[in-house]
Amino acid sequence: MAAAAVVVPAEWIKNWEKSGRGEFLHLCRILSENKSLESSTYRDFQQALYELSYHVIKGNLKHEQASNVLNDISEFREDMPSILADVFCILDIETNCLEEKSKRDNFTQLVLACLYLVSDTVLKERLDPETLESLGLIKQSQQFNQKSVKIKTKLFYKQQKFNLLREENEGYAKLIAELGQDLSGSITSDLMLENIKSLIGCFNLDPNRVLDIILEVFECRPEHDDFFMSLLESYMSMCEPQTLCHILGFKFKFYQEPNGETPSSLYRVAAVLLQFNLIDLDDLYVHLLPADNCIMDEHKREIAEAKQIVRKLTMVVLSSEKMDDREKEKEKEEEKVERPPDNQKLGLLEALLKIGDWQHAQNIMDQMPPYYAASHKLIALAICKLIHITIEPLYRRVGVPKGAKGSPVNALQNKRAPKQAESFEDLRRDVFNMFCYLGPHLSHDPILFAKVVRIGKSFMKEFQSDGSKQEDKEKTEVILSCFLSTADQVLLPSLSLMDCNACMSEELWGMFKTFPYQYRYRLYGQWKNETYNSHPLLVKVKAQTIDRAKYIMKRLTKENVKPSGRQIGKLSHSNPTILFDYILSQIQKYDNLITPVVDSLKYLTSLNYDVLAYCIIEALANPEKERMKHDDTTISSWLQSLASFCGAVFRKYPIDLAGLLQYVANQLKAGKSFDLLILKEVVQKMAGIEITEEMTMEQLEAMTGGEQLKAEGGYFGQIRNTKKSSQRLKDALLDHDLALPLCLLMAQQRNGVIFQEGGEKHLKLVGKLYDQCHDTLVQFGRFLASNLSTEDYIKRVPSIDVLCNEFHTPHDAAFFLSRPMYAHHISSKYDELKKSEKGSKQQHKVHKYITSCEMVMAPVHEAVVSLHVSKVWDDISPQFYATFWSLTMYDLAVPHTSYEREVNKLKIQMKAIDDNQEMPPNKKKKEKERCTALQDKLLEEEKKQMEHVQRVLQRLKLEKDNWLLAKSTKNETITKFLQLCIFPRCIFSAIDAVYCARFVELVHQQKTPNFSTLLCYDRVFSDIIYTVASCTENEASRYGRFLCCMLETVTRWHSDRATYEKECGNYPGFLTILRATGFDGGNKADQLDYENFRHVVHKWHYKLTKASVHCLETGEYTHIRNILIVLTKILPWYPKVLNLGQALERRVHKICQEEKEKRPDLYALAMGYSGQLKSRKSYMIPENEFHHKDPPPRNAVASVQNGPGGGPSSSSTGSSSKSDESSTEETDKSRERSQCGVKAVNKASNTTPKGNSSNGNSGSNSNKAVKENDKEKGKEKEKEKKEKTPATTPEARVLGKDGKEKPKEERPNKDEKARETKERTPKSDKEKEKFKKEEKVKDEKFKTTIPNAESKSSQEREREKEPSRERDIAKEMKSKENVKGGEKTPVSGSLKSPVPRSDIPEPEREQKRRKIDTHPSPSHSSTVKDSLIELKESSAKLYVNHTPAPLSKSKEREMDKKDLDKSRERSREREKKDEKDRKERKRDHSNNDREVPPDLIKRRKEENGTMGVSKHKSESPCESPYPNEKDKEKNKSKSSGKEKGSDSFKSEKMDKISSGGKKESRHDKEKIEKKEKRDSSGGKEEKKQYPFHLDVFSQYNGKL
């Protein structure tokens, strides 16, 4: 009673008379306001009455009080008696159950008190008979019960009996006659009804039988629908509604026998009655068979059977017998004619569809599984017919093709049928819904299929061209989505069930091609992955298609492509997704199937080709496939096969490329570059643009010509018939705006792949991915350049600064993309200017070309400034930078040889055609015409390129003076040129590699101011280790081509003096004195002569050998692979020297042995190079033939034979080399001798050249170094300790035969202490005495190994006594060596490099190597700090010279006097001339120098002062080559007279050299002091010349 307390609280009952009664009445009044029976207030009202009555039963309230209040409440509601009776009914049941007499008595009294409120009749309905008896309402409860049963039986179970004997047959006869009469007259249904009523009454007919007879007649006269429906409506007004439904149900039940067949007329009557709502579908549905659960079971059984068939078809059959069994089973299944059981629900559905009652038909289909009803052909055809009728007006308006008549479809006469569609909007009302219920079974009606497709095509045309309001656009968007759903759920599945209908496939493509490829591919994806599982029929079709595809693919070969292709085409018309999925899976496994499959696809429809493109993309995007092989170093074969197939199939057939291109772009956006392989293949096959690093030189030369020459001679295969396919590719790129995005993504991915893949992937794979990105970018860029028009290119490619700064494109890629745009733009401007003035002269044409170049390139010059920091433009001008990056090989040279070669090929071909007697005359004529036309095109193209190159060269000639600014040193200029121009571009492509080499040569030939060709070549060849190590495989190949072309030029100059004199003799690029003023005058004394150039070339060859050996000995995969590739590329021009070639051969042979089992690819490379190297061994020459070199004197010490750090001379011949290797003792002794001699040579040769090589600052630096010698003495002790560490000679490192010989040679250099002691210049008497003592001690140590040690000590003392005399002799020696025949010539013998590597302690060497590793320059030049250290060391040695064997003092003085007189005369003349030149230069440039800022002066001093040294510092990773001491000995002996080989005579000569060197030192010191005064007084005045002596390029003369 908790709920009762809520409605009627106990307090109300307690205070009933005071307030409770009023509260209760108020509550009931409120609850009675809502009269609804279903509202909550009604239930609360019932609850309140119940609680009040219950309180009376419990005795809390008197029944009089309750009856009074209930009487008052009865006024509130009319239904009060009924509610109160319900309450009494509940209380009656409860009190009976309680069996408490008091409560029962209270209940009886309450009811009796309320009898005036509730009638007896109501109480008799609700209360129990026993309660009624106790209340006195009935006499006996038992009698009451019996009477009630009788009445109910009579009402519900007794039927009125119409006895047929009593019913007269005449009545039924008259009824049938009445219904069967002619109804075309004036008879109406009302009149008919009155007659029927009369007959029923007259003959006492059963009304139900009369209704049944009316239905029978209606069934036989279907044409009078309206009449009978009106009659039945009128008749049913007199009957119960269920009667008609029961009679129909009885009729249907009659035909539900095992062999019964329900007549269609009955279905039609039922359908019409349903349509006119005379019966309810739910009432009739229960009378029909089969039951819904039986239908569901049947559907499931069909799916299970379909899956069973799939399992059978996909089962692996091992024997031929089983195959035969399977074929027999298939035949039996086909023979079975399935007789469907009588399904009354489907029959009624068909009738509903035929009369156009779509709503009731839809309700029936909703009760069944999806597509169950439509899977029955009659139902499907009925739906199709209804759709035909509904879309007829719209199809007649928009779908009928021009010229076609068509067969009109008559509309239904039924007004209740769906309305016909007049517009696309009307299709939404019913038609799309009908298609959804029809599903894949539209296949039964191909005509309707075509109609729907044509309507869809018309809608898409209207949709794409419509510019209506926003509301209309929203409506059309909805219709578009409906068409897409129809295509997904109806059209494509129906096509799968059609029997190879190619026409329907083409018709469907007419609509599909108007969809964007995104919509199409979504539809194909649903078709392939979802649709075939939605219906048992489609499951079977899928299995059968796969089975057939397997059969065809097993038999597909190159020989039977045509018949197999026809079978594939036939199978693809209906089920392309399943077929192509299987074919692609086979291609991924067996790449030899690619060619026959591509050839067999020529019988496909357009839709099938589009589906093929989708299937390819889906196969590529398969997440379950690994894109790398198990070794993680190579791309998987399945991906390579698919890529190859893509290229072939997209080239041969007109397939839409947009989806594939977008897929590649999306993969790049996601940072995945594997799929670039696809793009590479597609571009190669479709456009004929081939990217390979294995191009021959003939092909490479052809690639520098015009487009025709490229096509004929630039590729491995003949490029034929690519015009259409390349046009298709171009259109796809432009239509979807993918041209530039793909380029930018590739360029960004190229740089990003290193960081994205670097940590996880193998270095070899990362390199391949980088190369793939780069190669595809180059290939794609070439395609765009050759196929896009000027307007398209300019419209799509932004300016260079936008590309680099906004899109973050690397500079090399940005210029690569922009270069064709500049060329197109210049060409179009030039053509415009030519047209404006026709018939102008050649000079005017050149002028116009230059004008057009300026117009196009001026904005580019401004744009490139933002690409680098402002400091860069102090070294090179933006114009030079832009010119370098904008030109190509096509602009620089004409490949006459290639043109001639291709023309000759055509001539031979024409001759072969003439000689061919079997060829038909017509074909012969056509072929000859083709060859002649091609020949004319080539000749015309050659002429056009010749004119173009002439114009370009004229332009460059005018521009060259502004290219390189004189604001910075030539060393820095070359650094920036190499760093920003040469190195980035030479590894971009093979043609760019050739271009870079030719451009350097061109800049040299143009006599470009401020450009040092010598320095440029030296920086390129000096140290290639880091460049090679940082390259990928393809970049190494390109870098090798670049070095090959550079070596070709150098070798041409080296091989012939006349060529050298002609091309280099008077060129500013070969000046050895570098001037900061920009004046590169042709002073012959400043030029490098031919012999010294040959020394320099030998040095370069030695440097290449040293770098190669270093890379080969590292053991690193990348180092070894890349250096082998580079060496293979430069093989035509290197090695030329026999001992260098032998050194390389030994190292490569070692690689072959070591890598044979470990790394097969390195082994293959090494073996290939080794074989080629051996084949060129006959072309190698000894070193003395390569550059001029005197044979060594018989008794010469090692110091004469070897340069500092050079190899022992015994290695120059085979026998001496063998003796060195066989005898360890002899090797050690010769090394000690050579090192003791080397220290003296080093001191002498490091004096003046070090000062000269410092480019202007050397004088002051040397002077300061001499003054600071006292400070250095403390450091010398530490240095002596370091010098004790083992140092390896260069020959031991570079040219050692094997690893076992190295430890023998890597011993401490004992004479380092002696050298360090001698390098200290004595300043006082005490110091001299100390110096002498140290010299004695150290000389005694080496007495056993050096025969002339005592003579050294005496000579040292002699030098200390006469320092001024030695300086005079040095000066004389300088004048002797520099004056030949009246003109100044630089002599390498007097110039010396810094300390060799073998003399540098190990820690110091590591420091230098680390500095070089971190140096920003591409050529790895040294830092200023290192250079200054070496300058100090060399300056400290300024007054220390050779220590030859002693001579008698008298002889020495006599010879000294003679030499001194001669040298003084020459030195006076030289001083006068130098002073005069210096004054002139000072007067010419004093104004300019005053304007130079002090910080710039300082920077120039520092940078130029180290220029000469920097080259040696760059050699630190390996042993630096230094001047040949034999050549020096030769030069020195010429200046001091002839000698015949004795030790004393040799000592006399060396003494002269040392004294001559000191004289030169004093002469240089005077110049330095003058310059220091000038610097300290002026402050702003800059030095005018920077001596760039040959020590920078001096070579090792070490024997190999």
Swiss-Prot record:
A motif (Nuclear localization signal) lies at residues 923-928. It comes from the Eukaryota. GO terms for biological process: generation of neurons; mRNA export from nucleus; mRNA processing; neuron development; RNA splicing. It is found in: Nucleus; Nucleus speckle; Cytoplasm. Residues 1-163 are annotated as: Anchor domain. Keywords: Coiled coil, Cytoplasm, mRNA processing, mRNA splicing, mRNA transport, Nucleus, Phosphoprotein, RNA-binding, Transport. The keyword Transferase does not apply. Residues 1175-1597 are annotated as: Charged domain. The modification Phosphoserine is found at residues 1222, 1390, 1393, 1417, 1450, 1486, 1516. Belongs to the THOC2 family. This is THO complex subunit 2. It comes from Callithrix jacchus.
